Amino acid sequence: MQNKLTKMLNLVSTENDFYKDRLEKNAISCSLDLDQYPILTRKEVQENRYNMFSFGCKSKFFSQQLRRQYSSGSSGTPVNVYWLYKDYYASTLPLWRQRARYYGIHTNDRMVKFTMNAYNITHENNTIHYINDPNNVLTINASLIHNEDEMLEIVKLIKNFEPVWFYIQPFILNRLIRCYQTHNICPPATLRYIETVGELLPSDIRRRAIEFFGVRLANMYGTEEMNGIAYECPHHSMHILTDNVFVECLTTEGTIEREGQGQAIVTNLNNTAMPLVRYNQGDIISLTNQTSPCPCGNCAPIISLIEGRKMDEIIIEGATINTYLLVELIAELNNTYNDIITDFKFVYHNSLNMLVCYIHLTDNKNMWFESVAEDITQLFWKKQETKMELRFDVLPFDPNTETNKKFCVLEVKE
């Protein structure tokens, strides 16, 4: 890991103008000393997304030879991160190695993957959006699952597909178990592993999943910006994937530590096209260095706490609005309008049965507000069941106001 970190710091200090400028502005005397580097914020990545390319990679961006990873997550600040394809696949290898080592899961095993990507999809009642490509991967759109009938259709799809493992969010896993139990349906006999991603895994959902499916379950902590960050071993320790990332934490005292509790500060060790050095991931973690190897044999540091990731839902007349769908609305609009939305949040007013989308546009783009608001509204209803009685509105959002400093994707007010 240390060798890969040194190589990354050498690259950014010699082949990346964005970081060379940061070195000069922060009077960094040793470019290979990570401790001297300042924290990189999501806002900085958002504002400099076309200026962070290493030498030779901007031309690849314009010729569409880079892989784009979009992230808005639970932060409310959307960012794009670009990768060379070879770097992206190298970044996924550490996780695949651990899957094979711990649970016997390989790239050719049949997998059901629940995704939140809902671009260019108009929802129709009881229609399930999925693709089966490559042949061993069934990808199901989870942001457009609104009711029990649609979940039942997914159960039927899974049965016919005969998967070996699920890659699934706890929010969806809980609904899936409930559907199986409600309709007295047996889970697929081929299933032998579940991997939960995207949010916190509550202990009750973990217990229910293991009891119902009778398989091994592991939690994976990762992000679109970094790929895998930490992975749970059979002894329930979340080990850092040290061949992919270097993790620190920003404490409440403002110091950056290699151990302790605070905001996750992550350096990617594989992305040479658009390096992220000391990137503030935003999640609250507890980071522990092991004094002796874990019983699984892994000596890597352990993340024992992850806070700040929770997806909520509103159920209106039997239909479900979840934050995955809301986040994807913003993602699709940003894809259309070239990242015009810089900040967002949703507020549901229970007494008014009204959902409000608050957005903040890039500088000098406020003249586009009405057009963007209209498109958000149309897109929202395309992805919902039209029979639902709900008021929906789009209003301006000031991310700098005192009341908006604590962010959540979906806030519910009485």
Predicted segments, located by residue:
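Short, charged beta->alpha transition segments
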Residues: 65-67, 125, 151-154
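Short glycine-enriched loops at secondary-structure junctions
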Residues: 65, 116-120, 171-172
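Short, acidic Gly/Pro/Ser/Thr-rich loop/turn segments
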Residues: 78, 119-121, 271-274
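Glycine-rich, histidine-containing beta strand-loop boundary motifs that form or position
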Residues: 83-85, 115, 169-170, 221
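Nucleotide 5′-phosphate-binding alpha/beta core
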Residues: 1-70, 75-109, 160-167, 189, ...
